[in-house]
Amino acid sequence: MEHKDKRKVSRRQVLRITAVAGVSLAMGTGLVRSLISRAGLHRVSETRTQMGTLVIVTIVAPELKVAREMVRNAFGQMERLEGILSRHRRDTPLDRLNEKGFIETPPPELVEVMGRALTYSSITDGAFDVTVAPLLELYASHFEASNRPPPDHEVERILESVDYRKVQVDEDAIVLESSEMKVTLDGIAKGYIVDQTVRALVDDGAERILINAGGDMASGGDGSLENPWTIGVRDPAEPQGLLANVRLGGECIATSGDYIQAFTHDRHFHHIIDPRTGYSPSQASAVTVVTTSAMEADALSTGIMVLGPVEGFQLMKRLEDTEGMIVTKGGESMTTPGLDNLAV
C-alpha cells in the first residue's frame, strides 16, 4: 500500500486519466470549465502523495468552498485508514499483528479488509494471498543487497510460512497460526480506502467523483452515471501508449503488471509473487479488471495475474459484474465481451 518513505512515489501508475480528467482537460480546459460553470457546478482537483503513491481526487459539486472542503476531508479519510491498514508505518494495528502474530479487538476496518482478503484468496484458489509478505521482504532484501534473486532454498523455506488458511479473523481477534507469518494488505487496502472515500464524498453531496490512487481508480456520484469518465489502459509493451479507453460511470478499475515494479530488466522477477510457488508469474504481462469495487478490482487484478491467462480469463468471465483484459507475455490481448460495452 505504501513505501517507508511517504514522499517517494510508487511506479505503479498503470492507468492515466483521459478526457475530462486528463487529455481533454489539457487540450480544452476552458470549454470544460465553461460547461461546468453554466451548470452551476464547480470542479476541484487535488493531488497529494498518499499510501506511497500519487493520489488525485477530482470532484464536481454545487459550491466551490464546499467542494474544496470535501476534497480536504477525502484526504483526511485516506490518512486515517492508512494509519490502520499500513504495514510500513510503525505501531499501526496491522504492524502490531505482524509483530505479535495476533491482535485482540482489532479495528472493524482491519477485520473487514482481512475478511474480504480471505474471500478473494478462496475465489482465486490461493493466487491472491495476503500472507505473501515474507516472500516480498525476501526478494526486496536480496535485490537491494546484491541485485540478484534469493536462492531457491531460501524461497522454499519462506514459502512454508505463506498460507491464507492459517489466518483466523473475527471481530474479537485476528490470529496468525505460525510465528513466521506476516500479512501485507498492499494488494487490497488501497482499493478499500478508495472505495470508502468515494462513499464519503457521495454522502457529502459530490455530483461527480473520480479518485486515482496510483492506478486504482474509482468513480462515483450521479453525475458520473450521466457523464462517465474516460480512462486509458496502458500497453505493457509500450507503457507510454494505450491499449484501450474505457468509460467509468460508477465502476472501478485496477491494473497489475510486470512492468510496474520489475526487479530485472527482462521482467522475469517483479513485485508480484505467486504465493503458491514463491516466484513471479511468467505468463501474463498485465491484467486490468473493471468491477463495482476498487478493492475487488485491486485484489482480482493481482490474483488473476498470478493465475495466468487461461485460468485467470475463465475466472474473470465467471464473476458477476466483472470485466477485464489480460495481456500475455507474447503480447496477445484477451478481453471479456462486456468490456466492449465500456469501450470508447
Spans of model-derived segments:
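Mature catalytic core of soluble alpha/beta enzymes
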Residues: 1-344
